[in-house]
């Protein structure tokens, strides 16, 4: 399928945006995942270097990841991911007062999680490349209703300085085309600044698209300011 990302989102493909490596345990905390969620069809968008897909599939589940960076060649992508792990670790250590390090086993534990997640994702990519699809919001190369849940980590709201209200709404509407439920985390920007006006405006616009939204608490977040996630569902969606 031809990927047709909107030009606005091409700005998010540059080197300023981290290709982040996170584990399934971190996703479980951020998105409040439970056993029923993990039995469904999951899309991680953008997947980055997260090992969630690899771990879900290794346990017998069904998950895929979508990210514009997957269009890179294998060695180019590996280099970008490993460089961004170094950059992410350095950034967080430089702002260590903004994080609850005990949640990730201290500075050393946090770095180990990042490197392990990246290694696991890259190993899975080599073994099962069909799980990692090159694509970008707001035009994903996936069929409507091809998943039960879309997870969106550290893109929307995180880069609010580069994405406006319409960008956020268009992205969420597209993810809601793929699955009846979308979970987005965090609701602060990359510096931890709250975005109440943007969040309210997004929710209001989504309602006009017949998408219901609610804000849920996140238990023991690693980033201290990132205490909530946004859950978006089609208004006709019946939760199990």
Where in the sequence are the language-model features?
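Conserved SAM-binding strand-loop segment of SAM-dependent methyltransferases
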Residues: 128-140
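Class I SAM-dependent methyltransferase Rossmann-like catalytic core
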Residues: 2-40, 51, 55-59, 71-82
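A short acidic, Gly/Pro-enriched loop at the edge of an enzyme's catalytic core
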Residues: 138-151
